[in-house]
Each structure stands twice: as structure tokens, then as C-alpha cells.
Amino acid sequence: MQKRITVRLSPRSVKSALDEVASLMSANRDRLDDAARDIAERICEKAQANFDAAWYDSLARGVRGEADVKCRVEKTGNGYKVVAEGPEVTFIEFGAGIYYNPPAGASPHPKGAELGFVIGGYGKGQGNQKAWGYYAEYGNLVITHGTAAQMPLYRAFEEVLQEMKR
């Protein structure tokens, strides 16, 4: 948008021009904020759909469960962030165990190693085995192969980024 502001050499004219510049800056900030919120909401929607389609492994129950994850957008000091909450978020995003993922110490997630989420690196290192067990909240023993890295958040971000480039 190109805007012309005319200023005469008088205090009133200069003040009027400064007020107009401030108004334009405020409008631009509002438009940028709206765009950032819209982008975050699109990422959140795609991530939620990806998490809704994700699974985690639980051999003890004989099922592959559906993820209990909820995504939301939060305002930050200078923009927005997408938050995913649920007990399986980290495992579904970055993967757990060598059964479904690359060897221990590596990460199938492009940001996994950088963020410290490598296969077999969580807890007692049980993900180095093809199957292991842990005790769930009611003392039930759960046997698992782990979970494939499904990267719902990363994939959502990449999808929105590609849409914006078109």
C-alpha cells in the first residue's frame, strides 16, 4: 500500500502528519497480528487433525490406541504459539522405541536430535529394546513396542508453510 502524507511547515501540520503515521503503523500492526493469529489457527487445526489420526502402541491392551491430545492457540508477547497437550504428545511427535523408528540415539524427526528427543533417550533407555513394559496410572503393567514418530505438529507447520508459498 502506498500512501502519501503532505506536511506543511507548521506545528499543526507536522502533528497531523505524525498522527497519520502512527495510525498507519497501528493498522499495520493489527493486520500483522491478524495474519499471525490466522496462521497459528491453521497450524493448530491441521495439527489437531493429525493428532486425531495418530496412534500409540499398547500391546498389553492388545490395541493401538488413539491419541488423547488437544491443540490450542495462545497469544504471546509478540505473536502466537500453538500448544499441544496430552500424555502422548512427545511420543507421537518424536517417536519412542526402535521397533518403529531408526536406531537408538537417532531421531526420525527433523528437529528431534536438536531438541534432545532421540530414540531410546527417554526414561531408563528402555526404547533401545523392541518391546518393554511400564506401570500405568492404576498399577497396570503396559507392554509396548513404542510409537512411530508421526510428527503431527511438524507436518502441520510444513503444510501451512507450503500453502503460504503458493
How would you name each of these model-derived features?
Residues 1-89, 96, 100-166:
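Short, Lys/Arg-rich flexible segments
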